[in-house]
Amino acid sequence: MCGIIGIVGSAGGETVAERLVDGLRRMEYRGYDSAGICTLHNGALVRRRAEGKLANLAAVLAGDPAPGFVGIAHTRWATHGAPTAANAHPHATGEVAI
């Protein structure tokens, strides 16, 4: 089972990355193997992912923030592929994130 949350904020307001991680934390349960977020900043997708628990994603974001006022966050329950940061959701390429 995965946890997914999306936030649409206001330009000029606070960025959504911290709120996205908090939203995943509120839905947190045992069993997921990785987590990630993807935000929209100046027309470009900004993605951060980590293997393991949400604390690992928070550590990634502390060192490499994900600016933006719109975003999605996702925890992954592995049904295929190894539990790695590369397999963590969301996946993104170009202008598309899923």
PLM regions and their residue ranges:
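N-terminal glutamine amidotransferase
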Residues: 1-98
